[in-house]
Amino acid sequence: MDKTTLSVNACNLEYVREKAIVGVQAAKTSTLIFFVIILAISALLLWFQTSDNPVFNELTRYMRIKNTVNDWKSLTDSKTKLESDRGRLLAAGKDDIFEFKCVDFGAYFIAMRLDKKTYLPQAIRRGTGDAWMVKKAAKVDPSAQQFCQYLIKHKSNNVITCGNEMLNELGYSGYFMSPHWCSDFSNME
């Protein structure tokens, strides 16, 4: 044991360096363990990358999909702005276009309107998904029309708007899909 005697105000103090040595040894050991762990993780990652592991192939595919979806965001922003301007032109002098109506798309009815704030097509939503599409049994189907009217009366508080809102909530905007009621509405009027 390495001791040093210090005299302070006529008091002799013995300072033991042994505890300081143990602390230094612990720091050296923990540093060595840390670098060994980092080296092991690096070697494992190198092995994964050079062994053509399917996990990294999936991650690469996921990154490509994520970048593609980010590219869609700018396209959807542009299309949403164009459709909003188009909606403003359609709404000029037509206050009834802001009220829900059953629009006939041939094979189905959708209860829809233009949104008063964004001037984008808006439809009554089915749960947390897309719009209610009331399929018709025949070319003229009064029961489908009646159910569409029921939706307007009782379900009009749950709506989905084409464009950015739909892209954020459902993963698609509705404009670049065919057939879809958002793109079909743009072609109808």
UniProtKB/Swiss-Prot annotation:
It is a single-pass type III membrane protein. Residues 50-189 are virion surface. The chain crosses the membrane at residues 29-49. Keywords: Disulfide bond, Fusion of virus membrane with host cell membrane, Fusion of virus membrane with host membrane, Host endoplasmic reticulum, Host membrane, Late protein, Membrane, Signal-anchor, Transmembrane, Transmembrane helix, Viral envelope protein, Viral penetration into host cytoplasm, Virion, Virus entry into host cell. It comes from the Viruses. It holds the Pfam family Pox_LP_H2. Residues 1-28 are intravirion. GO terms for cellular component: host cell endoplasmic reticulum membrane; membrane; viral envelope; virion membrane. Contains two intramolecular disulfide bonds. They are created by the viral disulfide bond formation pathway, a poxvirus-specific pathway that operates on the cytoplasmic side of the MV membranes. Changing residue 170 to E: Complete loss of interaction with OPG155. It is found in: Virion membrane; Host endoplasmic reticulum membrane. GO terms for biological process: fusion of virus membrane with host plasma membrane; symbiont entry into host cell. InterPro entries: Pox_LP_H2. Belongs to the orthopoxvirus OPG107 family. Part of a stable entry-fusion complex (EFC) which is at least composed of proteins OPG143, OPG147, OPG155, OPG86, OPG94, OPG107, OPG104, and OPG099. Formation of the viral membrane is necessary for the assembly of the complex. This is Protein OPG107. It comes from Vaccinia virus (strain Western Reserve). The gene is OPG107.
